Amino acid sequence: MKSYKTLIFIIVVIVLLAAVCLFFPSDGVPFLGRRLFFPTLKEVLSPEKSVSVDEKMRALEESIKMQAITDSINTARETARQDSIRFYKKFFTTHSARFYLPADDYSFFDTLFEAMEQCKTDSSIVHILHYGDSQIEEDRISSYIRQRLQKQFGGMGAGLLPVMQPIPSASVGQSASGAMERYIIAGMHQNRAPSNRYGILGQFAIMSGNGSISIRSQNYSRTQDNVKKWNVVRLFVGTNTTPLSATLISGKYSKTKSIDAPNSSPTALTWYLPSPTKQITINLTGNAELSAVSLDGHYGVNVDNIPIRGSSGTFFSQIDGNSISLTAKTLNVRLVMLEFGGNMMPSITQNNIQNYMDILARQINYFHKICPQAKVILIGPADMSTKIRGNLQT
């Protein structure tokens, strides 16, 4: 038989079977005491899939196992969380190395962490001021805290920097040139200014004419990653007796900000760079008090390293609060860490201890007044060990 005849035969058979499927009664027909059934077109074209009971049971068992694993993980996490809560409750109330919190209130820092957690969703920033003596120079301690917090909550850059920086840092390199003079309220390099407008860093520079500030990221092995770039730059100006012009240059980017008239109130000039950078120069013209420069990201947390060599932290209440308030508000300062006491140790007596405590209490109250949203931590001098007959003792 020729192939086309075979094809015609197959088509005829299919058509006949389809006709039978279409017209055969759905309830069948009786035949010799039995009932004959024939599938409908729907049953032929869309047959019901058979279900394997074994496959169903295996899938159910897998689902039960996965749910058991998930429940076990959730239970372990909740147990770990409860264990952590119990540990820190005990730590904050009984441990010898604990944070001494007001009324042992372990929720004392909740508002701080809430603010840091909101940084990403609100595109906001939070700053932590870390004041100290020479123990925190070169961005020691601050850099570690900054890196951990920026990894958790976002952020970049080194935070607040003085306009004129005589102390080297592991995070950024700085230079300043032109008609500038540096004033600092306390410490070994104390140079008192004609006013008490020392600003948030306890130091500022007076510029008369032209000046330039250059900042670049460092690349030492101990330089933390997040500090190497920034894309928001702020220049905090205390007062200016003439119009002030400030041009920020970074690669091909160049933009000028200005204060058009003399101003006796603090001002912040802000540049939002199109992309993160590692180096900037700010060229200035005018007569002004320059309080600080800050390097940040568009959102996140920053820790400001503010060392004052030779200081015991007793000077803050001498600073004009207005020279601090604008900077603290602009940067959303939520925590102030005061790490002092080492320079008092050589001359300490019981009477001196009480006097020093009273002075530090005034400094804490001062920060509560000018930074009402900020918590304050006082970190005292560490107990340093020494070798006695070959053994380390305190």
Indicate where each model-derived feature is located.
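N-terminal regions that are enriched for targeting/export leaders
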Residues: 86-102, 106
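Short, charged N-terminal helix-start/capping segments
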Residues: 52-58, 62, 262-276, 383-386, ...
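Coil residues (strongly favoring Ser/Thr
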Residues: 71-72, 83-84, 96, 111, ...
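Hydrophobic, well-ordered secondary-structure segments
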Residues: 49-57, 78, 82, 114-121
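Alpha-helical cap/lid subdomain in secreted, periplasmic
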Residues: 1-57, 195-234, 238-254, 296-394
